[in-house]
Amino acid sequence: MKIAVIGAGVTGLAAAARIASQGHEVTIFEKNNNVGGRMNQLKKDGFTFDMGPAIVMMPDVYKDVFTMCGKNYEDYIELRQLRYIYDVYFDRDDCITVPTDLAELQHMLESIEPGSTHGFMSFLTDVYKKYEIARRYFLERTYRKPSDFYNMTSLVQGAKLKTLNHADQLIEHYIDNEKIQKLLAFQTLYIGIDPKRGPSLYSIIPMIEMMFGVHFIKGGMYGMAQGLAQLNKDLGVNIELNAEIEQIIIDPKFKRADAIKVNGDIRKFDKILCTADFPSVAESLMPDFAPIKKYPPHKIADLDYSCSAFLMYIGIDIDVTDQVRLHNVIFADDFRGNIEEIFEGRLSHDPSIYVYVPAVADKSLAPQGQTGIYVLMPTPELKTGSGIDWSDEALTDQIKDVIYRKLATIEVFEDIKSHIVSETIFTPNDFEQTYHAKFGSAFGLMPTLAQSNYYRPQNVSRDYKDLYFAGASTHPGAGVPIVLTSAKITVDEMIKDIEQGV
């Protein structure tokens, strides 16, 4: 069969490879001039920067794409586990290193508050049990009809997840110490959600980091995108770049997706898998006579969106890789207040930031004697933060100054401005324009209870035959391992349909 995949982000690349490995003819259409989507790369002034995701969690999910296509993952990506997850700075003189080794972890916890290990381990145990339930009964399956969700098994297993509790509540149930609470709460920002609003299940991220480890891919995270692109080429997939999709064509008589309009041409296919940002697809790519019924264009703006981010890619003329960790988190003095600012549409004068220094793990990513630094500051998306003008250069200069002051929390970056030889910024406007991300959201639809599982955009269209969706705004959600799972479960359904002649 001839299959079209819209989008060459990590979801599209993984899905296309899985389909092609089953013997089908696959073409990927990508609007930009490179693969990767939000897993993007910037090469500038001799530096190589990952532009999007940077932390490799759940490596088995990465490996599975290659293995299930009959290939050895080591021929495509080089993974290695980190001994330490990150350095966390509460202020200039208060930094802790978070290890993966349990003995070291216990020592770290006891140094913060004697006796805290028991509550921490109880938290990890509770969350691990919830994760296993969620993975088996909710995350790794699709919902094609109401009875797939509304059944006794889902009711019983869902009750065990205690989804009405928020991430903050679960953390505070086990942890009294404010510093340790912060260590467990900030990761919800990895998927763009407020820990006060996110279901307690989303506190799984620190559990995954500590129980499964954090890894690094040689060449940076973009090495995964390159590995997937090579996998697709080896499987005979055709990747068309600079191919802007104008419309998904729906046959009005048979109510099926049978073609796409790309760069002015109509291209026929047997099935279409769309991995572009779902809200933008529902709003702009469906014909007027054939909207996605649950998500017509006029309702898209009313959905809840994850936060966005202001990113900086900085090159400095000194090598500091032996004085800083690969991954670093610098907390705002008022951590809770900063989160409120993000989700209430305000910019912060004292933000929490994430700092990634890839040359710590791979010297080839910066010129000799120099260092590349990636900084992410969570911000409101464009709907909540409608009063923020990201095109205002004076404003972005102010934000850069705020970030440089915050970076000075790490001693080696105290005089960073005098060493800058390269600087690039990426704003919520860029998320919207570059990736067609609705409202510049960095992580797609916010995974609130009302926008999760059965209530999230589904992988198999309920309105039109031969149309499928995958990616961060669809089930099961955002984050690289999760969108790889989205690709897997969607392709599994497509292959099942092909085998059954549906």
From Swiss-Prot:
Name the reaction it catalyses.
Answer: 15-cis-4,4'-diapophytoene + 3 FAD + 3 H(+) = all-trans-4,4'-diaponeurosporene + 3 FADH2
The pathway where this protein functions is: Carotenoid biosynthesis; staphyloxanthin biosynthesis; staphyloxanthin from farnesyl diphosphate: step 2/5
InterPro entries per the UniProt record, alphabetical = Amino_oxidase (IPR002937), Carotenoid/retinoid_OxRdtase (IPR014105), FAD/NAD-bd_sf (IPR036188)
**What's a Pfam family this protein contains?**
Amino_oxidase
One GO term (biological process): carotenoid biosynthetic process
Annotated FAD binding lies at: 5-17
* One GO molecular-function entry: 4,4'-diapophytoene desaturase (4,4'-diaponeurosporene-forming)
Q: Name the Enzyme Commission number(s) assigned to this protein.
A: 1.3.8.-
- Gene3D superfamilies, from UniProt? FAD/NAD(P)-binding domain (3.50.50.60)
Q: Which UniProt keywords apply?
A: Carotenoid biosynthesis, FAD, Flavoprotein, Oxidoreductase, Virulence
Which protein family is named in the record?
Belongs to the carotenoid/retinoid oxidoreductase family. CrtN subfamily.
Question: What is the role of this chain?
Answer: Involved in the biosynthesis of the yellow-orange carotenoid staphyloxanthin, which plays a role in the virulence via its protective function against oxidative stress. Catalyzes three successive dehydrogenation reactions that lead to the introduction of three double bonds into 4,4'-diapophytoene (dehydrosqualene), with 4,4'-diapophytofluene and 4,4'-diapo-zeta-carotene as intermediates, and 4,4'-diaponeurosporene (the major deep-yellow pigment in staphylococci strains) as the end product.
Record-given protein name: 4,4'-diapophytoene desaturase (4,4'-diaponeurosporene-forming)
- Give the organism, scientific name: Staphylococcus aureus (strain MRSA252)
